[in-house]
């Protein structure tokens, strides 16, 4: 009898906490707050609305160490993952791959990309392999990290001037964007807009995105885009944005912008995402990618 009661309590506990991971907020507004403490921040984030707040005055060393010039020195020849925004809008495309370039090469590419369609993200490995970068990122944890976290991920995002990422959403417990150089323009819409965004679940790259280009929609999506209501904000240097799970968002980069991302997940969040995680690993192990060789420069070709 006692054992049955314990099992019931355990199942009830799991149900309450896992179901909380699926809760969504649909209010079309962005909260703004003055940072007071991590406890206060977690209370506001639990409402699952976008939250904009100043973090530069709270942890100035983080922003000072990750400026555009410092990132160039820290990354230099490190290889970053580069994507072309246009690949997301190819008809019937369900997966978008990346190429790897040294950060210096990407920096040069972004400066000559007049059309604004290259950006880099998914650079978690670079940060984990760099003791200096890991140390800098860990300084922000006491101000952002919720309780009972079992998984922490950091990222560096940047793009050509004017590059606009596709509408996407995530399922993490906490995800923050922090601008350390330049500025970004973020557009967001709640989960209920998914019926107009034609959601694509890319389990090969564990990415959930929309093939609908909000800025210049394909004629087949134009009627749907007119029904989408959005909120938007500009994030300057020193500010942070909490992106709630299941909120669609798109980022527009300005010149020389550096965005740092911190993502935190609890055991309950990982449990709630097990079906998607399993599909990702199955897809990952069953997919064989062909690595494209870089195009040789004219001078190199002549030497062959």
Whereabouts are the PLM-identified features?
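N-terminal accessory scaffold of Fe(II)-dependent oxygenases
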Residues: 1-240, 248-304
